[in-house]
């Protein structure tokens, strides 16, 4: 069964299939797909395409190949592809900020420079209470996953500077994982506890965990209110690798660790 990442009804069916034991897989767009997509946009004007991070997928290479072919076809149009080095709602947050700049009338060159300067500063902090999909993807070993499940251990992960997933620790239970995520935000967010920038949270079929994470952030950061924090579903593509019960926190801060 084929699921589209942005189909809410399909997302519900997707998680239902996972609960029944289905093992989803993903595929990426080819160069021709990108050419068709980007060419339709070029008909309307110059294009700045912010691609999903190369640390997670090679699709940015296909986008760059398509862009090169289209630039040769029409050198009068400007088409730029940027490797965001971001993923999931961190990627969405970067694009959201770029769109804000565009809507304020900033030039394409200004937006491009801002994205390049800030993409490595969007922190991706996440954890999971279900280790089976991380075992399948090689993030944790089979033995570690079994022991972790027995001991109720949550792996703590983040994206590094290049946008690759790094498992840097573990904690026992969801409450401690939430506490660690907030502590990381406190240490790395712009202005520390005075942070007042954007904050996104996403989850894979665990809305209660997302709400608990949001409440912990609001308690720790007085300038952020519950309504300021955007909570999103993890789409089918990312959830094919994380499985259910993953929650993630995104915020702007210093450079992510290399």
Report residues per predicted region:
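Mixed-charge interfacial surface used for oligomerization/domain docking
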Residues: 1, 48, 55-59, 63-68, ...
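N-terminal glycine-rich anion-binding loop in soluble enzyme alpha/beta folds
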Residues: 1-33
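Glycine-rich phosphate-binding loop signature in dinucleotide/nucleotide-binding domains
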Residues: 41-45
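Short, charged beta->alpha transition segments
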Residues: 31-40, 65-67
């Amino acid at each position: 069964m084929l699921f589209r990442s942005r189909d809410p009804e399909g997302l519900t069916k997707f998680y239902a299939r996972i609960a029944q034991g289905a093992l989803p897989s993903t595929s990426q767009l080819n160069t021709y797909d990108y050419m068709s997509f980007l060419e339709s946009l070029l008909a309307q004007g110059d294009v700045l395409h912010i691609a999903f991070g190369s640390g997670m997928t090679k699709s940015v290479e296909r986008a760059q190949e398509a862009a090169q072919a289209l630039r040769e076809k029409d050198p009068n149009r400007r088409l730029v592809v940027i490797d965001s080095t971001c993923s999931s709602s961190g990627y969405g947050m970067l694009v959201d900020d770029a769109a804000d700049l565009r809507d304020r009338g900033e030039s394409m060159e200004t937006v491009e420079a801002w994205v390049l300067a800030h993409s490595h500063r969007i922190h991706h902090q996440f954890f999971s209470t279900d280790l089976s999909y991380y075992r399948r993807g090689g993030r944790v070993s089979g033995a570690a996953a079994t022991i972790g499940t027995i001991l109720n251990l949550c792996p703590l992960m983040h994206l590094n500077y290049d946008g690759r997933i790094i498992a840097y620790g573990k904690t026992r239970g969801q409450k401690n994982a939430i506490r660690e995520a907030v502590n990381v935000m406190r240490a790395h967010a712009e202005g520390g506890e005075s942070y007042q920038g954007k904050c996104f949270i996403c989850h894979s079929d665990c809305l209660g965990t997302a709400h608990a994470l949001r409440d912990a952030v609001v308690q720790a950061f007085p300038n952020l209110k519950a309504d300021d924090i955007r909570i999103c579903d993890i789409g089918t593509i990312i959830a094919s690798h994380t499985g259910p019960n993953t929650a993630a926190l995104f915020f702007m801060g210093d450079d992510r660790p290399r």
